[in-house]
Structures are given as C-alpha cells and as structure tokens.
Amino acid sequence: MSPQGPGTAVDVDDEVVLLDPDRRPCGTAPRLAVHGLDTPLHLAFSSYLFDAAGRLLVTRRALGKRTWPGVWTNSCCGHPRPGEDIALAVERRVDQELRLALTDLHCALPDFAYRATAADGLVENEVCPVYVARAVGDPDPDPAEVVEWRWVDWESYRQAALAAPWALSPWSVDQMTAFGQAAHPLTAALRAVG
C-alpha cells in the first residue's frame, strides 16, 4: 500500500492533461490551478469499486475539498498524469485515497464526459472514462479526501441518483444515467472480456 499517512496531502503539484475540443492532448496545467470559474477541458477518470458481495463503495468527499465538499459520490476520481496510462492512474489514486488494492479493473464508459458548475461557481469540465473494479478489503481513507464511506447495493444507488440527484455529485448522477438500466457494471465488464 501507499506510504502516505492519514491526512497526508497527495498529488498537490500534479499536472493534468489539457484537451482540445476534439479530445486530443494539447498541453498540461497544474491540477490546483486548472479548476476555477472557467475550467479548461481536461482528462480525468472515475471509478466504481465493488466488494466480493457485489456492493458498491460510495464515498463522501471531505469537507475541505475545493469542489463539491461533503457530497456523496462514486468510489474514487482523479486525473492521470501526463503520459500515465489511465488504468494505472486509477490504481495509483485508489491506493492513495482509499488504501485499497484492485482486481478485475475494466473501463466501462470510455467516452464519458461532463461539465458541471458548483454553487460557488467552480467548474468541472472533464473527459472522464469510467472504470469498474473489485476492491480487496475495506477502505482506510485519507481523511483529507474522504470523510465517510459505505458499501451499498448497486440498484439502491442507481435509484438514489434518479430520485435525489441533488444529494450526489453531478458526475456520479450523469454516470448512473450513462450506465442506464444495464446489468451490474462489474458483471457486465467481466462478461465482455470473459
């Protein structure tokens, strides 16, 4: 696992990959500087992690987070570093944020993108492939990143996104819509490669 200790800031000086309107890399920018009132399109990822029973790990963003503090969301999100394989970035970020190892990592929504504006005007503007994986064990989250976590039933979370979208992160709500009525996403991904 990561050498990071609880409460340790991670990736503070990371660069994110900027994208042109055709979603091609066109430069880099510091992660902390890129998110603002006029956030440029950039590359990110989201992940949905499941336990051995098929339950989804949902997390509540720490209250000190710059964007959407205290909001419930999918398992983990982040940004690949310039030149970094996105699947490896998912594994790196999950280890840093949740101190979890993964198996059966698959990209479920390779073309997902969204733009959302928070109540304070901060904008997310991301091409954000969505990954699913099986988590090994329970998380031990970095409190600077995650204030709470729960294992929940997939269908219950999908229904919550439909019934109370204001209670979840906007990207997670949009991703649940993109998953649609399909079967459990990890099962579907494993079946597709199997």
From Swiss-Prot:
Xref: InterPro entries: Idi_bact, IsopentenylPP_isomerase_typ1, NUDIX_hydrolase-like_dom_sf, NUDIX_hydrolase_dom
Positions annotated to bind Mn(2+): 35, 42, 79, 124, 126
Cofactor comment text: Binds 1 Mg(2+) ion per subunit. The magnesium ion binds only when substrate is bound.
PROSITE patterns the record matches: NUDIX (PS51462)
Residues involved in Mg(2+) binding: 97
Enzyme class: isomerase
Major localisation: cytoplasm
Sample GO molecular function, one term: metal ion binding
Known EC number: 5.3.3.2
Membrane-spanning parts: none
Subcellular location: Cytoplasm
Cross-referenced Pfam families: NUDIX
Listed cofactors: Mg(2+); Mn(2+)
Keywords: Cytoplasm, Isomerase, Isoprene biosynthesis, Magnesium, Manganese, Metal-binding
Pathway terms, separated by semicolons: Isoprenoid biosynthesis; dimethylallyl diphosphate biosynthesis; dimethylallyl diphosphate from isopentenyl diphosphate: step 1/1
CDD domains: NUDIX_IPP_Isomerase
Reaction(s) catalysed (UniProt annotation): isopentenyl diphosphate = dimethylallyl diphosphate
GO biological process: dimethylallyl diphosphate biosynthetic process; isoprenoid biosynthetic process
GO cellular component, one term: cytoplasm
Entries under SUPFAM superfamilies matching the protein: Nudix (SSF55811)
Active-site residues, as the UniProt record annotates them: 77, 126
Function: Catalyzes the 1,3-allylic rearrangement of the homoallylic substrate isopentenyl (IPP) to its highly electrophilic allylic isomer, dimethylallyl diphosphate (DMAPP).
Family assignment from sequence similarity: Belongs to the IPP isomerase type 1 family.
Protein name: Isopentenyl-diphosphate Delta-isomerase
Gene: idi
